């Protein structure tokens, strides 16, 4: 249905896809994400050729210059699926325009809070709302736009979160 071309896969989820038949899918590239030194070697069996690289290494090797292509602002940017609480799962699409307008509105609203209660460059953002929950209310896009440092803690584990906060 969504026909994704790129899969960003954290090593934590590798067991969920180890038997997936990538040759029958639209996925052309797999980008490996790992914070624990886990190698992607052997994880994808005969689909190892689809692994484009490790996320941090790809970022490090990338040029700081990029000429973004023009495309219609109503092009789909993200797709979310419901869990099917009222029937079959349903896909929800967000366009680039929707994400930009939401981010601008959110940044303007937060910038207008009294007593400097909003966010500003130099702040650190760590989402507690799951990413699948309406883009964590869209704030990761706003945080990127404003230039906040972002910390993504992974699975909800109270002790680990406290270690990150303290």
Residues covered by each model-derived region:
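Structural detector for helix-capping/boundary residues
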Residues: 5, 11, 56, 74, ...
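Short beta-strand->loop structural element characteristic of the AMP-binding/adenylate-forming
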Residues: 1-16, 90-93, 127, 148-156
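Conserved S/T- and glycine-rich ATP-binding loop of Class I adenylate-forming
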Residues: 7, 76, 82-85, 125, ...
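Conserved pre-ATP/AMP-binding loop-to-beta segment of ANL
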Residues: 60-81, 88, 114-124
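Residues at the C-termini of beta-strands that transition into short coil/loop
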Residues: 31-34, 55-56, 62, 129, ...
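Structural core segment of the AMP-binding/adenylate-forming
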Residues: 1-57
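Conserved AMP-binding/adenylation subdomain of ANL enzymes
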Residues: 100-124, 132-166
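Conserved AMP-binding A3 loop
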Residues: 77-105
